[in-house]
Amino acid sequence: MSFTSLPLTEINHKLPARNIIESQWITLQLTLFAQEQQAKRVSHAIVSSAYRKAEKIIRDAYRYQREQKVEQQQELACLRKNTLEKMEVEWLEQHVKHLQDDENQFRSLVDHAAHHIKNSIEQVLLAWFDQQSVDSVMCHRLARQATAMAEEGALYLRIHPEKEALMRETFGKRFTLIIEPGFSPDQAELSSTRYAVEFSLSRHFNALLKWLRNGEDKRGSDEY
């Protein structure tokens, strides 16, 4: 086989400070790279689907807005004509009130559409989150963080008891494991003598949902 046709995989992690690179390290990096590529493809497909659904909802809302605007313009023209012909103040007030009711209804429909878009995005995010492998995501983040902290010396990993076997199988003696029964299964803390990094997939995801919902609440309190 010609060496010019061999497939190449670029590993972005820092190489170990050793003359000989162990095959286990290369295998781990290739596995993490494949998992990262698969996760990117899945998340890209989910986000693209969410964008398409959101764009359709927005187009429908804009179309309804245009139709309502045309109807309101037609009603307003009729109102002006009848006002000039009949000069009936009472009828004019009633018709104006009707237009105001239509405007309030339209405003309500737009608010409902915006709320529906938010809910759709939230449902897509929840579906994406449910499809994620907590173990693979945690191992990937730990490996990446360990590479960044490679110069820190001894590294200590605090984890939930359920993850002890997984971490020993994945990282061997790379970390000093400390079992924390109070941690959630998706929570971990990697530390050295100088600093520590803690992460929790569910906590970060819930923070994203909170930001999404708070953004909707703030817009709902603004004047239209």
Curated annotation (Swiss-Prot):
Keywords: Cytoplasm, Protein transport, Transport, Virulence. GO terms for biological process: protein secretion by the type III secretion system. It is found in: Cytoplasm. Its main location: cytoplasm. GO terms for cellular component: cytoplasm; host cell cytoplasm; host cell membrane. InterPro entries: T3SS_SctL/SctL2. Component of the type III secretion system (T3SS), also called injectisome, which is used to inject bacterial effector proteins into eukaryotic host cells. Acts as a regulator of the SsaN/SctN2 ATPase activity. Belongs to the SctL stator family. The core secretion machinery of the T3SS is composed of approximately 20 different proteins, including cytoplasmic components, a base, an export apparatus and a needle. This subunit is part of the cytosolic complex. Interacts directly with SsaN/SctN2 (T3SS-2 ATPase). This is SPI-2 type 3 secretion system stator protein. The lineage of its organism: Bacteria, Pseudomonadati, Pseudomonadota, Gammaproteobacteria, Enterobacterales.
